[in-house]
Structure formats: structure tokens, C-alpha cells
Amino acid sequence: MGHIVSLLTVVDIPRLHFASPSATVKVKGPTDSPEDSRRESLESFVESRCPSLYGGFKPASWLFNGHLQTAYAVVGDFSKIDKVDYDRTLLRTLDGGTIGLDSTPPTDERTLPDDTPIVVVLHGLTGGSHESYVRAILAPACTPVEQGGLGYRGIVVNFRGCAGVPITSPQLYSAGHTDDIRVAVLHISRRYPKAPLLGIGFSLGANVLTRYLAEEGQQCRLVAGCAVACPWDLVKNAQRLEDDWLHREIYAKAMASNLQKLMGRHAESLAKFPDHPLTKAVPGVMAAKSLTLSKFDNTITCIGGGSSPPFPFPTCWDYYAWASSHEMLAKVRVPFLALNAEDDPIVQVLPVEAGGNPYVAFAVTEKGGHLGWFEAGKSIGDVRRWVSKPVVEWLKAVGEGLAAQDRQIQPTHVVDGFLKEVGRDDIGCKEVEGGGHVIGVEGEGGLLAGL
């Protein structure tokens, strides 16, 4: 009966927002010769290469609103689908912190050409490369072409302390701190200088990606970006989470619980820095019985969510105002696709006009929840993420269709063992021991997935 109802479900056609006129992008011609390239409007580029955005999304009949779609993202069993394994590389940053790069396919599985497009992924709040929403994109993107995939390489940037990455300094991560993705991209571009780098971020990671792209401007090493379920205006969206009883008691507390558990796992590591304000704040947040996201951020993130300056912030609301990405969106200078659902219970304020930025295509579905977009498959009980379709189409379009762009990329050099960008000495990274093989479906037990 449920399958029959699903057949009657109204198709949700995304609303697409472009600046008028949209930017023109340089696309490849019949050959890779620069002489064969031509200019095409971003709107035409998306329309011709991302048909799923125009064909629509049909939500599974039993996941008919944003709360149910979001809940299924958390409690659904995705261990049997989208299996992705990785090789992990650990990077040490100048402040002593550690970030983890998980690369797929593993080197013992197959070898890819050096110019293979690379999908650089930023995960959500307390996620990592194991998250089902990450694997839902990387599985089709990194499956060999002869098996129906794109044949790309995927590299997930796991934030400090997430997905088993150790905490080695009294600094965490946040929605606004971009230096870790900056050095990660620096490392990836140095290792694969011939490969086009395509950025995609989910939720908090989408916010970080948007800010990074905006800050880099014409010097960006990524040739395109995609933001999925980005929280954009952190002040307004956090305020709505606080003001509504249901959102506060379910979503704000669930996210805070994840962060609280994550801090508990690293309390011993942080104890090695007894005089740091972050370490001193940990016992209070660990003892809290009813913690919301804003209370956690007011105690922990506004102190240790990034380097100084601008951290620490007086309150979480000062941090939210600084870290928001909605106003930064106007400064992005690479082709950029944003996808949000109107019924997302966590993200309810969407900057669809993108500050008039002609490089942005902003797609909004009526349904889908937060990192959900589940639709019924061909058989009863088969549920898949619709959002994988337009995202993979976008990755194929920008990875294979764009011609080389004129960008002002700064050269790199190695100073005292750290890879740095010439002219900038405050950030850098180097590989350190650790890492190994990572099985994506195993995940990080004890934390709610999908947030």
C-alpha cells in the first residue's frame, strides 16, 4: 500500500535561483584544445548538465515532511549501501593540531591517473568520512566509469577530533574557521598538481567551504563548489532553534549531545594543556545535564573554535555573526551550486539571491529535511537519497566540462618541513605518522549520524 501511495506522491520540482545575467563559464569544446573552448552562461550550463534539478524529487510517502526526512537520516541503516573505503593521511598544522584526509579509492584497490578530478569533501557538525550522506556522493563519484560511476578520486577532510582524528592542540574546529581546509587543499594540490579540485560541503562543512571560497576569491585552488544543507545565517537559524520548543528540545539538544560526547572522548588529550581556557571549560560542559547547541558554543566553540584572532569571542552570538556565510556568498568566484530544503528543521533562513552573485546557482526543494532528500526506490523498503543525482551530475559537469580557468594561484614552498604558500607564513602543514586503512561504513559509534 505504501508503495502505491508513493506513486501518487507529488513531484517536488526544485526552485532554481540565478543572478540575471548569470556568469559565463569557459567550457571545453570537442577537444581539450584551448582554441576549442567557448563561453556559456552558468544557467545554461546547469540546465543542460544537471537534469535532475529540473526533473524533480519525489519524497518517499512515509517520509512526507522535514522532521521525518531528518529523523531517517539519523536512524536509517545505511551500512549495506554506498560502501567506501579510504586511505588516511594525517596532517600536522603549525599550531600543533591534526586533521585527517581520507582518500578513496585506496591505493591497493586501484591506481588513478594524476589528472583525475578530485572531490574534496567537508562533513557536517560531528561527522566524518563514514557519514552516509558523504558516501552517497563518493560511492557513485568514485566508482569506475566502466561500472557506471565517474571514476573520480575523493578526499574527505576530517576536522580535528572527528572520525577518530586525534586532538593534539588546544584548538578545535568551527563553522567559520577556514585555515584547516586551506592547508588541506594546499596539500592536495601539491600532491596532485594536474587534477581539478572540486569542493563539496555538508551542513557545517558547507558553511566552511563557502567562507573558504569567498576568502580565496580569484586565488582559489578549487575550480568549483557545492554546498548541501548549508546553515548560512547562523544567528537567525540558531535563534529559531532556541525559540521553538520542538526544535530546541530535539535538534539543538541532539547536536549538543554529539558535541558533548565528542569532547568527552578528547578530554584526556586536552588535559595535556591544563592552563588553556578551552581545557578549563571542558568540565563544565561535560557536567551539563540539559545542553543545547548555543550553550555548548557559548562555553566551548567561542573559545576554541579557531585560531586567535578572532577567537575567543565574548559570546556564541558574536561567534555566529562572524562565522555566518550568507553575506560571504556574494564573494565566491568559482561556479557554485547550493542545495537546501525548505522544510529543513535546522536551516530555515535561505539567502537564495546570493547577494546577486552571478557564479551561484541556488536550488531549493520544498521537501527533504536536513541532509535527507529520501525517495522510494524500485522495491518496497528501498530508500535512496535523491540529492546524490544532481550533485553527481554537477561534479561530472564541472570536473569534465569546464576548461582551464585563468586564476591567480600562489606558489608553494616547504619551510622547516611545513608546506606553505609563498607570502603567507602563519599557516602550513606536514604529513605525520598515523592514518592507515579506514572502512567508511563502520562510522563513529555513540554519536547520532546525519547531523
Language-model-derived ranges and their functions:
Residues 3-31, 192-308:
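Alpha/beta-hydrolase-fold enzymes
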Residues 62-114:
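N-terminal cap/lid segment of alpha/beta-hydrolase-fold proteins
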Residues 93, 98, 102-168, 187, ...:
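Short, surface-exposed "cap/lid" segments of acyl-processing enzymes
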Residues 170-192:
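Alpha/beta-hydrolase active-site loop
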Residues 302, 308-328:
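Active-site nucleophile elbow and catalytic-triad environment of alpha/beta-hydrolase enzymes
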Residues 332, 338-340, 344:
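Short beta-strand/loop motif that positions the catalytic acidic residue
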Residues 357-373:
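Catalytic histidine neighborhood in serine/cysteine hydrolases
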Residues 368, 372-450:
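Catalytic active-site module of serine/aspartate enzymes centered on a nucleophile-bearing elbow/loop
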